[in-house]
């Protein structure tokens, strides 16, 4: 089920990724409707939201990504997070700046627990971590006008 250590962000992505790694197929129901209150738990620009987004994403990648993917993340992610933090600082959003570093602190403190979860995921693995990764750049697709998930897949 859901990882009880996650709160408010990325718990559903983490669950789907772990299910795929365990050999399950994640399916969609095209006619379904989802009513989602964005910012219902945390305000859009709150430091807590920045913290959970960064922390949970780091934890999810550590738990689920292949060794090669983790190497790429280990090289790129600190630089990208530093750029994000500096961007917050230049905008005068000091709390968001600090939230990025708090997320890294939590991630480092969680290392032992995450390593145990990773071993459990790998022991139950029947699928590949690579086959479900989008190979393009979401950032570039967004910048070139593909602002929806469906638009990015074209």
Segments (PLM) and residue ranges:
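Catalytic-site signature of metal-activated, phosphate-bearing donor transferases
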Residues: 13, 21, 81-88, 139-152
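A short, conserved alpha-helix in the catalytic core of glycosyltransferases
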Residues: 1-33
